[in-house]
Each structure stands twice: as C-alpha cells, then as structure tokens.
Amino acid sequence: MDMLKENVIQNNEARTESSVEPSHPDMMETVPEEQQKPISHIDDLLSETANLMAVKEQLLKEIAENEHIHSMQMRALQNLPQEAILPLQYHADPRRRHRMQKPESYKTVICQAWLESKTCAFAENCRFAHGEEELRPSLIEARQNNKYRTKLCDKYTTTGLCPYGKRCLFIHPDNGPNAYIRADKLFEVSQRHALADLRDQMEHHIMNGGRSTAGPQQFDMFARPCTPDEPAANMPLGPTPVSIRGPRYELPSKKPLETEEAGNRPPSSWPLDPSTFFALDSLNMATRPISPFESMLIGAAGNMQYSMLGKQSTPGGVSGYSSSGSTPSQDSDSSPLTAASAAADAACQANSESAQSILLKSINNPMIGNETTLPIPGLDQLAMDIAKHLELW
C-alpha cells in the first residue's frame, strides 16, 4: 500500500513540474496550494480501496462458512429416511407451500358443484363436503369477523345457492327450511339430485348385469317427485341438505317357487317381467278409483279381481306389461274381452302357488306345457291397450 501511494505521488509531481514553469515570480507562491488537492483525493481513493478489500475478505470467509454448513446439512440429510425428507422438501418450496390444503378448512364447507347437481369432478378427492355427513365443524368462529351479518350474501341472492349455509357470514333473506338453498330453487335442485340418484341406480344395475346383489332393496326410481304445488316447508329433508324425497315403493318380494323358476329363464328385464305384472295385488292398489275402460272389462269378465288391473308405478309412468315374444295365432272367435276374461280367471287362481307357477309357465314358455294349460291369446295387445288407456286416464 505504501509503495502504491509513493508511486502515485511521484507521478503527480512529475506532471505538475512539466506542466507548470515559473514565468512570473508570483506563480511560485500558488503552486504548493494546487498540488495539495490531488494528493487529498488520492488519499480518499486509497482508503476506499482498503475498505473494499476488507469487505471482500469478510465475504470470502462467510462463503466458506456457508459451504461448510451446507455440506454438513447434506450429510445429515443423507442419513435421514426418505419419509422424513419429503415433508422438508414440501415446505422448502414456496409454490408447494402455497398449494397446501389448509387443515382447518378441510371439509368444513359444502361443495358448490355437488350442491347444484350432486356431481363433482373431484369425487372423493374433493376438499369440500359432499353432504352433511361429511361436513366437519369449523374451527373459526364466525362472529369473530367484523363483517358478520352486515350485508346480503351474493351467492344466495343471485344464484339461490350458498355452500356455507348457516355458517355464512352474510345475510340470507327469506331463509326457508333449507339454509343452503333458496325456497324458490328448492324444487329445481331436488329434481337434479333425483336425476343423479336415478343415474347412479341405473349404472349400478347395469354393472351387476341386471341382477340384485342383496335382498329387497329400495330404488330411487320409485320415489314420488315433489310437485311445485307442495309448500317448501312441508317437503321432507333427508340427511343431505337437498335430499328431498317422497314415499318409496318396493318391488314385491319373490316367493320360493318364483325363485326356482327364475333359474330356468334369462335375467329379469324389469318392467317387462311377467311376474311383476301378475303380482300387482301385493302393491295394495285397491284404493285407486276405477276408470271407465276398466269397468267395461270388469263387466265383461264377470267375477274378476280388481287387483289384476291395478296400476303399477314405473319410472316412466306407464303400467308394465309382459312381452312374451310372438303371440300365437288367435282363434277366429276370440276377442279382447274374451282374452281379458281368460286373463282375469287365470289371475284369480294366483292365490295358490301351484296355480301361479302354471300361469307363469304358460306366459314365459307358450310353446311348452300344452298338456297343462294353453297360452292366453291376444295378451300382448290387451296389455298394451290397457297400459295406453291407463296412461291417458
């Protein structure tokens, strides 16, 4: 440092001596004052250079220490198991930390997509609740918010749906029996959920090959849909906020004899199953009023049980009938009334298991068992006419 300073001073003196020649006696007095200014400037530069060099040495020491610490950390991580390394990497990445699910809000709010149509693209991986069964208690008190109940809820007032329900921080005007859905939207949403349940039931039925995997089951397709005339307050609420259903009807349970017969034929194709058509008396439909067409058939058939003409509840609203393949050729003197009378007489004998099995055999296998009984002529056309008339009635 001293040698550098001496060299700089000598160079400056040589420059000043060569450039300044004393031509006047007064100039000799001003030269020493002008030479003092570059010398002081050089001193400042030298001090700054010394400071920078000291800072550089300090930084080099810190870098060496950091490298040593980093090497020690890497050695320690190599000795840790893989299960302990993954959480550390997850928290070290700020992008992953931003995408972390907040545990305090998991499953504390109803899923908006599920609330609208009971369908969600995330399915079981959704972080929101699909129904009140999955809803968890919130760890945050709503009243701690300064905006609690100070303005109207935008979702509830505009769309009619709010996934927060009673936990919403805002006001739900005209709150009906359901805190999640506005009263005028309740029927529309219930129909969407009913269609979703029906789709799930049909998919389950198709996956099982048309066979029931358990005992008697209740199907949503028999559920009575709520009508707009019913007040929203009287609609029954299920376990989920929009599970609105009416009374359900069950299929008649098969008797042991019918179970044996089912093994000798293809799987049931409900509602075209003959057993469901001729076992309508088990649905207890005797309280329904008689249509004019049915009264005409009753008068022509004589002592015919009314349960034979009971209307079966089907998803389409059309009475079920049996389609047993091609109908045998009718006699020249046979008529629809004669066929109805024969069908009624056969149905009256269904109280005994033996008579009912004979009737089912004659319908399912019209070409077999001619010694026992003959197939009823015109049964398909008669059943179709009855179904159309009952649907119009």
From Swiss-Prot:
Disruption phenotype: No visible phenotype. Double knockout with oma-1 results in sterility due to an oocyte maturation defect. The oocyte maturation defect is due to a meiotic defect in oocytes in which the maturation process is initiated, but there is no progression beyond the prophase stage of meiosis and therefore the cell division process is not completed. Animals also have a larger number of oocytes which are larger in size, but the oocytes cannot be fertilized and accumulate within the gonad. Changing T327A: Reduced phosphorylation by GSK3. SMART domains: ZnF_C3H1. Residues 14-26 have a biased composition (Basic and acidic residues). One of its GO terms (biological process) is positive regulation of MAP kinase activity. It is found in: Cytoplasm; Cytoplasmic granule; Cytoplasm, Cytoskeleton, Microtubule organizing center, Centrosome. Residues 313-340 have a biased composition (Low complexity). Keywords: Cytoplasm, Cytoskeleton, Metal-binding, Phosphoprotein, Repeat, Repressor, Ribonucleoprotein, RNA-binding, Translation regulation, Zinc, Zinc-finger. A zinc finger (C3H1-type) spans 105-133, 147-175. One of its GO terms (cellular component) is cytoplasm. Coiled coil: none annotated. InterPro entries: ZFP36-like (IPR045877), Znf_CCCH (IPR000571), Znf_CCCH_sf (IPR036855). Residues 1-26, 227-251, 311-340 are annotated as: Disordered. GO terms for molecular function: mRNA 3'-UTR binding; mRNA regulatory element binding translation repressor activity; zinc ion binding. The modification Phosphothreonine is found at T327. Exclusively expressed in the hermaphrodite gonad. Expression only in cellulized oocytes. Widely distributed throughout gonadal oocytes from the mitotic stage to the developing diakinesis stage. Zinc-finger RNA-binding protein that binds to 5'-UA[AU]-3' motifs in the 3'-UTR of maternal mRNAs to suppress translation in oocytes and embryos. Acts redundantly with oma-1 to control the temporal expression and distribution of maternal proteins and thereby promote meiotic progression, oocyte maturation, fertilization and embryonic development. Also, together with oma-1, is involved in P-granule distribution during embryonic development. This is CCCH-type zinc finger protein oma-2. The lineage of its organism: Eukaryota, Metazoa, Ecdysozoa, Nematoda, Chromadorea.
